[in-house]
Regions:
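Pyridoxal 5′-phosphate
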Residues: 1-167
Length: 167
């Protein structure tokens, strides 16, 4: 299916086909580094070495420190960790601005934060499914600690100008 010339796959915003080279690397890692990297035995130590090497490579690519990276098992877990962690470690403000068409893995932690007293402002999309960045920016104030906006909507494929929003 991956190399089917008749296939015109148009759902990469939701799930992307894995490139063969990536599948090979994943397969090798799963075969050679299957052990718990926190264990004391030799296979675990090898898994820890591989994990640390991967973490260092990602850190170099992103221009950050290895200790600043957290690997999660999926995007939903990563979203929960990022949103709850960012909000609950802040020492000022309780304002959060979010677009109305975020993934449930973004919506649910924000509902939890709203129940804890955070002020979650939801900005609706325009008729064409894109986000009015000016409305998002207008919702930001001195108490805003977090803005959540997907770059590409995984259901309708619209792209949002997150570069402008982040500037």
């Amino acid at each position: 299916m991956l190399h089917d010339p008749e296939l015109h796959y148009l759902d990469n915003a939701a799930t992307t086909i894995v490139a063969p080279e990536v599948a090979d690397v994943i397969d090798k890692a799963m075969r050679e580094h299957w052990a718990n990297p926190s264990s004391l035995y030799a296979p675990g130590a090898r898994s820890e070495e591989a994990l640390n090497a991967a973490r260092a490579a990602v850190a170099r690519t992103l221009g950050c420190k290895s200790k600043e990276l957290y690997f999660t098992s999926c995007g939903s877990e990563g979203n929960n960790l990022a949103l709850l962690g960012a909000a609950q470690t802040r020492t000022f403000g309780k304002g959060i601005v979010v677009s109305d068409f975020e993934h449930p893995s973004v919506q649910r932690p924000l509902e939890r934060l709203a129940a804890q007293g955070y002020n979650v402002t939801v900005v609706n999309p325009q008729a064409d499914g894109t986000l009015d960045i000016n409305k998002m920016l207008d919702a930001v104030d001195k108490n805003t600690i977090l803005v959540a906006c997907m770059m590409v909507n995984n259901e309708i494929g619209t792209r949002n100008d997150v570069e402008r929003l982040a500037a």
